């Protein structure tokens, strides 16, 4: 017999959105459904973001469904405070207001079959359930591409997930790798703090003026994510479809020569990186702003991954196992996508119960 009807793994924007709608459909938090979250506190991945990130400089954060009942909105939040603190605080009040009873910190290690049910194994035991909603996002699966000599580097390898503040790199020579907004944010923050900055990208950065940032372009990028998910393919990056907005701050950085990419280095040596032409740049640290992959290792026993590299998912539901839903996967990864998907997934769950 199942311990609960639904287990939601992850209490970020996607997990909380599903929980909100399950509660609206009169399921009881902590009984009919339980939420297991690995984080030490509220906020999902936001609680781990770097100190200098502000809501005004981050991708737009949409409100969770029902947040207006608390009189809260990220649109009116204080943009002088760290984004990590604002999001964590708002999510804490949200969980309390709706009585979601999130259990944390609990780390899920695997999900497997037991008869007709699923078992969610975690560091505090096992929970047997009829349905699992995976809402683990990507923060726990940072992606760092391999380059020759990586293991020989005597300096520090940092990733977006481990970067804390510019001060820890004061006076050092830093190479930032990546062509997205995180890489640009690091360069802007490190300017005047690091001793020397170099920007490495695999391809030229696609800067776009505001007039080029259309709704159609955003819809097309999300559609590409959806098509890949439905085909069971590895998910493309969003920035590859939308480009990077040329804001005033970014345009100024380009004009003064800060935001000028050099291309990609060929290999890494103990004290720096070597380029295709044989020239070398000394480095004390390399920041890999190279993105994340969906965190799905705990689902491996269910053998959902396709040969094409992804999971076959449509409207948040696994095509291979009707008991598995993936909130925040592919086209649902943004905050607005996660909110809409929460309602869609909750309705499908109710149809099964």
Language-model features, listed with the residues they occupy:
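Flavin (primarily FAD) cofactor-binding/catalytic cores of flavoenzymes
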Residues: 2-40, 44-47, 52, 79-353
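Redox-cofactor-proximal catalytic regions of oxidoreductases
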Residues: 41-70
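Short, basic/glycine-rich phosphate-binding loops at helix/coil junctions
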Residues: 63-73, 228-233
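Short glycine/proline- and charge-enriched loop/turn segments
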Residues: 68-74, 154, 306
């Amino acid at each position: 017999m199942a311990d609960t009807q639904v287990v939601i793994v992850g209490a970020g924007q996607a997990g909380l959105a599903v929980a909100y709608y399950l509660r609206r459909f009169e399921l009881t938090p902590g009984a009919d459904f339980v939420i297991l979250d690995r984080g030490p506190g509220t906020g999902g991945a936001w609680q781990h973001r770097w100190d200098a990130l502000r809501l005004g400089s981050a991708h737009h954060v949409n409100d969770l469904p029902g947040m207006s009942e608390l009189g809260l909105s990220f649109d009116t939040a204080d943009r002088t405070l760290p984004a990590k603190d604002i999001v964590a605080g708002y999510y804490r009040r949200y969980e309390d207001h709706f009585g979601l009873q999130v259990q944390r910190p609990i780390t899920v290690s695997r999900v497997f079959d037991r008869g007709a049910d699923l078992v969610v194994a975690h560091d505090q035991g096992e929970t047997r359930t009829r349905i699992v909603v995976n809402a683990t996002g990507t923060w726990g699966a940072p992606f760092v591409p391999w380059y020759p000599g990586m293991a020989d580097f005597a300096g520090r390898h940092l990733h977006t997930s481990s970067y804390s503040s510019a001060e820890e790199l004061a006076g050092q020579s830093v190479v930032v790798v990546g062509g997205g907004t995180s890489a640009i944010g690091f360069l802007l923050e490190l300017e005047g703090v690091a001793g020397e900055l170099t920007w490495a990208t695999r391809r030229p950065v696609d800067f776009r003026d505001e007039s080029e940032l259309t709704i159609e372009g955003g819809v097309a990028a999300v559609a590409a994510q959806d098509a890949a998910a439905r085909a069971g393919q590895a998910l493309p990056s969003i920035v590859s479809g939308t480009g990077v907005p040329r804001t005033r701050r970014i345009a100024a950085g380009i004009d003064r020569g800060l935001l000028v990419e050099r291309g990609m280095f060929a290999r890494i040596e103990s004290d720096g990186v070597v380029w295709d032409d044989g020239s070398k740049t000394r480095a004390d640290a390399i920041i890999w702003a190279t993105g994340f992959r969906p965190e799905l290792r705990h689902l491996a026993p269910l053998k959902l991954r396709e040969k094409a590299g992804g999971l076959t998912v449509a409207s948040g539901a696994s095509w291979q196992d009707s008991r598995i839903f993936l909130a925040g996967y592919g086209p649902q990864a943004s905050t607005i996508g996660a909110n809409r998907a929460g309602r869609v997934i909750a309705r499908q769950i109710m149809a099964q119960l």
